[in-house]
A protein has these predicted regions:
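Non-catalytic accessory regions of SAM-dependent methyltransferases
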Residues: 1-35, 39-41, 45-48
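A general structural signal for well-ordered alpha-helical segments in protein cores
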Residues: 5, 25-26, 56, 69, ...
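Conserved AdoMet
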Residues: 30-106
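Conserved SAM/SAH cofactor-binding pocket of Class I
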Residues: 95-136
Length: 136
């Protein structure tokens, strides 16, 4: 089936303001369905297999029910790394990134660090990668 970028954007504009719908449509097309960024911005049609067509329907349904894009994708970005998330795991927040950046500035390299209620693991993994001498 041929699907246009404008079709996806229009479907999302029924639920979201235009700028947010445009951003979500780019994520859906390029990151989730594998459409190239160039083809996306040129507005080229996507040819979807029946499986991808069902996936698109599911994605649009979930987004129009205001499920966070991170849960729909199954991933969230945190300080340049990608972490798996699902509805039972809190989505890493920018404020948490700021906290970890501050810790990286102030914590001694060989510190002992405990992350309680680790969720996605973004704090512990990032601190462990950035402070290899620390015990996390």
């Amino acid at each position: 089936m041929n699907v246009t970028v404008s079709h996806i954007r229009s479907a999302l504009q029924e639920c979201y303001p235009p700028r947010e719908a445009a951003n979500l449509s780019r994520i859906v097309c390029c990151e989730m369905l594998g459409h190239s960024h160039i083809d996306y911005y040129l507005g080229k049609d996507m040819i979807l297999s029946p499986k991808d067509e069902k996936e698109l329907e599911s994605i649009l349904f979930r987004l129009c029910n205001f499920e966070p894009i991170q849960y729909v994708q199954g991933t969230a970005r945190f300080l340049g790394r990608t972490f798996r998330v699902a509805p039972g795991v809190l989505i890493p927040r920018p404020e948490t990134e700021e906290l970890v950046e501050r810790m990286l500035e102030e914590v001694a390299p060989a510190s002992r660090i405990l992350d309680i209620g680790t969720g996605s693991g973004c704090i512990a993994v990032t601190l462990s990668k950035e402070l290899p001498e620390a015990e996390v």
